[in-house]
């Protein structure tokens, strides 16, 4: 067999086992062929398709970055049990996957990357698309994958394939180590012959690890939770990937502890659950943020504690706050200097905590506070969803209309711009897999490709749930090429393009930091009104609806009239009923914002400026920054079974 043939057949025989679930670890390959892989990986895929049809399906992609996004979208829908391989040619084909690799690793989601590499023999150096560095002849562009991958290796000799492939799969299915896994394949080595042991090609099962909490760590966590007066749970993506949403629901119903979710943790509890207060942090709800600010114990479950979750370390203001961090990854479990890490599976740990803790831990006063904050925020969202009758509605109205049109099991997909923040505050999640916002790397262009991957994941599970992609014009222009794949494979998506003629999110941020929305509006060069008046500005004559229609998709354009929201609702109903993909285009007013959730995000403002707007922003920034805390540990003593002590700020 050739090296490529052996690798492809090896991948076809890998299985992930998670309890009663058994599925192919690599159910298919995305690819774009070039001279670096058409005779290697390309030939191997064709040969296996002839010999064993359907065992390793090949899906033609249009952009290499988008291949990885599809893999991540699929992996998220399958709770990290499965992902696709992405095969790219040498040079620019390979480097196009770098952004996707970073996204996968940042999100702790598996993706297998197979970039072609230059000749191992160097017999034809420099080959087409090869980068040369005089100070290191052995360097190739694929070395750029090293800091972006959780595992990287290069098959320099055929005999290396066996150990590399097994180790790659080991990392891919490990919940604590997973991310981008990269195997660089020199184009000459791909086609070399090798004697392959039958054991290498035999079916192999990878049983997902569900590590139990250590007794000592669990006992310390239990003591801290018992002693806490105002505990608060931050539910992260680990709750979803562990399948622990049922255990979380039972735990909070028993104890009364309130929950705020990260972006990845959306779906950990249904929006209308009594203990669920919505998103927490910079884009969170006022309900979650007010309770988080007063919490004396934060129980982080499967969270990375990004700056958006912690409000750039302003969210947790109790002087003696402590953290019980439950995570399969020690790196995340030890964050915020906690002395109470629980390095274990979320589902197993919640089961153990439920068995060790009594019912109804929180006081009546605290429970009433939780209920009151929830009622207030729910009413705020209701108000945000009320149609304004404007020709160009605000984004919150659009979100509310999409929400009303979807079924509970449908999936909303987003990643970048102002939509993630609005969705985190406003979207009412009704299914553990229904909220799919990529906000670890927050990559413009993820939406359509990631949505396609999510839909593949749903179809593979036999689900007919609709996947609704909401995308701004900025992200659409960045990467919409996988619409061709949607059409080619007849996969149904509902795509809502929200056009605000610029980078609305960064425009708002620019105004906040005193940069006056400079460079954030889509206008003809040279006639932007930087004073914000819009006087004399000409919009770019780009017709995104026509562009989408050119792919062969059904397209509905919502005219800017007072009935725009009603028209959007009707278009969504028709799209839901249709078996085909539908793109719905609507214009929005970028200056109509979602309600304030009282979170903060640290974006530094210049200390010196001649612009009055920047000087004002700097004063505001300095005031907000005073709430930041280092969170290095030792703030309280709950873990030892004592009561929170006062912190005089002396550091003693």
Which residues make up each language-model segment?
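A short, charged, Gly/Pro-tolerant segment at domain boundaries
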Residues: 182-191, 370-377, 589-592
